[in-house]
């Protein structure tokens, strides 16, 4: 569905098939009345799922089959190294999208600093936790494949990257 003056859809539903056989659904909308940029991410598998809501950014829900939902909060000692490095506020203090982008810029700058200082970084160093050129190219290829599928009567379209 195209909004006035738009070149791409304001509202999309995409069926996905991943390598290994997993299937998914992506729903993205800029026209859901009352949502106010309410980004939600839910991923479900055979044994459980995870859920995150932009309006509650410090909380991640983990849902296992036949177990109670587990709630993880930012800035707590049980988080992994990269999650801890990305946390800028103490527990119970909300972080927002500005901090998320600041983390990307900080990690990129720290990576460049390490290169300039000829320091080797381990594969799991937080300084390497930022989107790479390949991620951007893959994202653009995904959008092109979705548009191609839409123009081709919504037929399955291979993502070539």
Predicted regions and their residues:
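Glycine-rich Rossmann NAD(P)(H)-binding loop
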Residues: 27-31, 44-47, 160-161
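A broad, low-specificity signal marking well-ordered, structured residues that form hydrophobic/aromatic
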Residues: 24, 41, 157
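Beta-strand scaffold of nucleotide-dependent catalytic cores
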Residues: 25-28, 52-53
């Amino acid at each position: 569905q195209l909004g006035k003056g738009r070149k791409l859809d304001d509202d999309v539903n995409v069926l996905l098939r991943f390598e290994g056989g997993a299937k998914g659904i992506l729903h993205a909308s800029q026209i859901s009345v009352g949502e106010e940029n309410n980004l939600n991410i839910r991923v479900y598998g055979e044994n459980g799922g995870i859920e995150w809501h932009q309006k509650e950014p410090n909380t991640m829900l983990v849902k296992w089959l036949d177990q109670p939902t587990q709630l993880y909060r930012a800035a707590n000692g049980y988080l992994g190294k990269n999650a801890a490095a990305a946390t800028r506020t103490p527990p119970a203090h909300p972080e927002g999208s500005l901090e998320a982008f600041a983390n990307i810029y900080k990690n990129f700058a720290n990576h460049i600093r390490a290169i300039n200082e000829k320091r080797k970084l381990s594969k799991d160093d937080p300084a390497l936790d930022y989107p790479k050129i390949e991620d951007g190219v893959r994202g653009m290829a995904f959008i092109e494949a979705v548009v191609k599928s839409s123009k081709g009567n919504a037929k399955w379209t291979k993502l070539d990257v």
